[in-house]
Every structure is written in structure tokens, then in C-alpha cells.
């Protein structure tokens, strides 16, 4: 396979006409305020995946969900979110990233209100599906908006670090916030809290984010490609989220996966023949975008091992309350924030993207590996905190360079699509990773119970295996980054001169 040229950070900036246009009409203070608005929107969407998990028992009791139907409170969101990321990104390229961002956040906000006011099962699940759709559209174009706001290498690296912290740390913040809202108020407020925030985001976006003509304006929407890729992704997500319940070798699961593969094959055929494809296949010849997407799949799987498996270990083995679980994640989040916001940009400007990315992933792998030895009577300070510190360090270092790598090769006319691709890789990696880890942990637990181990010890043994696999995922991502990623280093004078110093 021949790969497209991967420009350096300065080349990316020079070639970004859309970014230059946006930058010329936006002063520095307004650009940073606009970034915080984009981050607030991203945080709201990321939170919604994990914040619901804490409230599921309360939702089940209040609305009368069965164990099977309760899963659709989560799956309804994931189905539309995963299905519409690529289409949302391409629509942003065609009709304007700012316009699609506002539409996506508006849909998400109204759907959040509907979720909070829901009094029946079907109304909650339907509103969750609309939430996922709005979240997908907004997420797919947010990276493009951010890349357009910042043109200087140092500023862009710093902005990407802040954005990466929100994307990586939002999940564990959701656990804390979900615990607080559920314990002090009720489950309705985990959704209602989004409404005023969403309205504020829309108003501030109209005020702070400049209007830039769509880079691919005038292009036609590949309707057949849009239908097939969205259907393929939704079928894949459906099979994954139901795999553990229905069985991975069941007729239903295999049939849905086969249907997803067949529809995706049809999508590839369509894209190779139409004049203006939804996803130009040459995009996947861009080395850093393809590599970053592969890293994203493994890294998201490892992060889900951290968020969900650690939360289950703390709750079911160490008997933590939801609020205590949220507080347990705080040290990792604080460290992640310090690195992402203050130091990650300096590391990228000085060393490029490969070294910080590889080092961060290896630190995260070590953090997950430490959890493999967490005992059933573990102490937070001795058995959990060291892992949280390593994972915070690793995530804080890794997210900035992986996002820069993913977006660095892409022309402005396809930046929304590239953002959709990398977001899809993270989403699918998280979904597949969680399904695999949950299945492996459950199987290991059952085996240990059958051989005479106590229930708590068996649960811990299942989580230990999940942590080990998560560590392997993170280490595998580090190897891919070290061997396949093309370095996009700033020029020497930028790496060591004034621009780098301005990152702080």
C-alpha cells in the first residue's frame, strides 16, 4: 500500500485555507473562548455515556424496565451515535461545520429535556436515540471547527491538548457527576442538567464561532453511500451491544454481523464508482489518519477497561458507593488535566507526536497491568491510586498527539469527514472493547465459581483478566504508533524557540 504524504505541523497550517480564513476574522481571546464552548459541548456528550450507567438501577425501578429492556437506555444512544458519525462529518464539509454543530447540539439539548421528562420506557429510549443522533453530528464536526480556529502550531497543539483532556477525562467525570445527581436529587436530573448547558452552548457558538463557508460547498451528497455506511455501522453496533446477551456465536449475532459486512461491502463498491463519494477511499491511504484510527480502536478499548471495569471492581469487590467511585477517579483526572492543558502541547512541540504518544500509551498499559494484582480487600492508596496516576499520565500524554496525527494529513474540504472517521474508530473501539472485556470477565468469573472460589474472589479474578487484556490493547496501540506513525514534527526553530514557550 502506498501512503499519502504526511505533512509536518507547519505544513498542515500553511495548507489550511479554511483555518486561515477563520483565524483572520477571529481575535485570539475569542478563539480561546470558542474552544471552551466546543469543549463544553464535547464534555456534555461524553458525559452522557457514563453518567447514565450510575443511574440505571434508579431508572429501572422507576420506569419498570426489565433487565433486558434496560440495556436499551444505553444501546439506543450508542446505536444512533455510532451510526451517524461519518455522515455527520461529511454533512459538515458540505453545508458548514458551524451550522451542523449548532443543529447537532440543538437536537441533543431538546432530546435531553425529553429524557428528563420521560415517564414511560418507550419515550426515554426514543429520546436517547435522538440524543445519540445529535451527539454524533456535533462530535463529528467539533474537531474540524477547532482545527480551523487555531493556525499556529503551538496554539493548535495546546488547544488539541485541552480538547483531548475533555474527550478522555469526561467519562470518569460522568461517574462522579452521575453519583452526585442520583444520590442528592434523582435520575431525571442527569438529563435535565444538559438543557441549560446546551442552550448556553448554542448561544455562545452563535456569538463566538465565526461563520466560514463550507470547504466542500457545492458538492453533492452521496445518498446511496450515506445510507449504506450508516446502516452498516448501526448493524455492527447492534450486534456488538447485544453480543453478550444473545451469545457471540448465536444465529442472531452472526446474522447481524454478516448483514453489516455485506452492507459495508456494498458501500465500498458504491464509493469506488460514484463521481463524488461520501468517503473518498483515497482518504484511507493517508498514513497517519489510518494509523491514528487503528490506535483509536485499541486505545478506546483500553480506556473502557479503565472506566467500566475499574468502576465495577470498586463497586462490587470493594463495595464503594457511586459517589466514592467518582471520587476515586479524581486523581487520574487531575493529572490528566495538568498534562493535557499545560504540558502535552510542549511535549508535542519539542518531540513531535510519536514519542509522547508511545510513552503515554505505555504508561497507561502499565497502569492497567498494576490493576491485575488488585486484591479483594484492596486499599485505595496502595492498590488503586498508583494505577490511576499512571493512567492519568498516559491519557494526558497520548490524546493530544493521536488527534493531531489523525487530522494532520487532511485538507479542509474533508476535515469533517476525517473527524468523523477518527470519532467512529474511538466509538467502535470502545463498544467492541467493552463487549469483549465484559464477556471475558464474566466467563472467567463463572469458571472460578465453578472451581470453588467465592463470589467476590471470582468477580475480582474476572476483572483481573479484563485489566490484563486492556493493558495488552494499550501496549499494542503503542507498538502501532511507534512503528507505523509518520512523524509530524515542527520545524526546529519552533520546537526550541519562542512558539514552544508560548504553549504554557
Q: Can you describe what each PLM-predicted range is?
A:
Residues 79, 83, 106, 110, ...:
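Generic alpha-helical transmembrane segments of integral inner-membrane proteins
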Residues 116-123, 206-212, 240-246, 268-275, ...:
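Transmembrane helix-loop junctions and nearby membrane-interface residues
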Residues 22-207, 342, 351, 357, ...:
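Transmembrane-helix bundle of Major Facilitator Superfamily
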Residues 59-60, 91-92, 177-185, 240, ...:
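Interfacial helix-cap and linker-helix signal at transmembrane-aqueous boundaries
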Residues 2-29, 484-504:
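Intrinsic disorder in cytosolic terminal tails and internal cytosolic loops
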Residues 31-47, 52-54, 67, 224, ...:
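12-transmembrane solute porter fold
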Residues 201, 444-453:
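Peri-membrane helix termini and adjoining interfacial loops of integral membrane proteins
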Residues 2-5, 12-15, 19, 161, ...:
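Hydrophobic transmembrane-helix bundles of small-molecule transporters
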Amino acid at each position: 500500500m502506498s501512503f499519502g504524504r504526511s505533512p509536518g505541523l507547519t505544513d498542515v497550517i500553511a495548507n489550511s485555507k479554511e483555518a486561515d480564513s477563520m483565524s483572520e476574522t477571529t481575535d485570539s481571546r475569542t478563539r480561546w473562548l470558542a474552544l471552551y464552548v466546543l469543549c463544553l459541548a464535547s464534555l456534555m456528550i461524553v458525559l452522557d455515556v457514563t453518567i447514565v450507567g450510575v443511574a440505571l438501577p434508579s431508572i429501572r425501578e422507576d420506569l419498570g424496565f426489565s433487565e433486558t429492556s434496560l440495556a436499551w437506555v444505553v444501546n439506543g444512544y450508542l446505536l444512533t451515535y455510532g451510526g451517524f458519525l461519518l455522515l455527520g462529518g461529511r454533512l459538515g464539509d458540505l453545508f458548514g461545520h458551524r451550522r451542523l454543530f449548532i443543529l447537532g447540539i440543538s437536537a441533543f439539548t431538546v432530546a435531553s429535556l425529553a429524557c428528563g421528562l420521560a415517564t414511560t420506557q418507550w419515550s426515554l429510549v426514543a429520546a436517547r436515540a435522538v440524543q445519540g443522533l445529535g451527539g454524533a453530528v456535533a462530535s463529528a464536526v467539533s474537531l474540524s471547527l477547532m482545527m480551523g480556529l487555531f493556525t499556529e502550531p503551538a496554539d493548535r497543539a495546546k488547544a488539541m491538548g485541552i480538547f483531548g483532556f475533555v474527550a478522555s477525562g469526561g467519562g470518569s467525570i460522568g461517574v462522579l457527576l452521575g453519583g452526585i445527581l442520583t444520590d442528592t436529587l434523582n435520575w431525571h436530573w442527569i438529563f435535565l442538567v444538559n438543557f441549560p448547558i446546551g442552550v448556553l452552548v448554542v448561544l455562545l457558538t452563535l456569538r463566538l464561532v465565526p461563520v466560514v463557508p463550507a470547504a466542500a460547498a457545492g458538492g453533492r451528497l452521496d445518498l446511496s453511500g450515506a445510507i449504506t455506511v450508516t446502516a452498516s455501522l448501526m448493524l455492527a453496533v447492534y450486534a456488538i451491544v447485544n453480543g453478550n446477551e444473545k451469545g457471540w456465536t448465536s444465529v442472531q449475532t452472526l446474522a447481524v454481523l454478516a448483514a453489516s459486512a455485506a452492507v459495508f461491502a456494498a458501500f465500498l463498491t458504491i464509493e469506488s464508482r460514484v463521481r463524488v463519494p461520501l468517503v473518498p477511499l483515497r482518504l484511507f491511504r493517508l498514513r497517519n489518519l489510518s494509523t491514528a484510527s487503528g490506535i483509536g480502536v485499541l486505545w478506546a478499548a483500553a480506556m473502557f477497561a479503565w472506566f467500566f471495569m475499574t468502576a465495577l471492581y470498586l463497586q462490587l469487590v470493594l463495595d464503594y458507593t457511586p459517589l466514592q467511585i467518582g471520587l476515586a477517579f479524581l486523581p487520574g483526572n487531575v493529572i490528566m488535566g495538568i498534562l493535557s492543558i499545560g504540558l502535552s502541547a510542549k511535549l508535542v512541540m519539542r518531540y513531535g507526536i510519536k514519542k509522547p504518544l508511545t510513552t503515554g500509551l505505555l504508561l497507561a498499559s502499565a497502569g492497567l497491568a498494576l490493576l491485575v494484582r488488585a486484591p479483594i480487600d484492596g486499599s485505595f492508596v496502595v492498590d488503586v491510586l498508583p494505577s490511576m496516576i499512571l493512567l492519568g499520565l498516559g491519557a494526558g500524554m497520548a490524546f493530544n498527539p493521536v488527534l493531531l496525527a489523525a487530522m494532520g494529513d487532511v485538507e479542509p474540504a474533508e476535515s469533517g469527514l476525517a473527524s468523523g472517521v477518527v470519532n467512529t474508530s474511538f466509538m467502535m473501539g470502545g463498544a467492541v472493547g467493552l463487549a469483549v472485556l465484559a464477556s471475558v470477565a464474566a466467563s472467567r468469573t463463572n469458571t472460578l465459581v465453578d472451581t470453588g472460589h467465592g463470589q467476590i474472589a471470582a468477580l475480582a479474578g474476572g476483572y483481573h483478566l479484563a485489566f490484563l487484556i486492556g493493558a495488552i490493547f494499550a501496549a499494542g496501540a503503542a507498538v502501532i504508533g511507534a512503528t507505523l506513525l509518520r512523524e509530524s514534527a515542527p520545524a526546529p526553530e519552533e520546537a526550541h524557540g519562542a512558539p514552544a514557550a508560548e504553549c504554557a
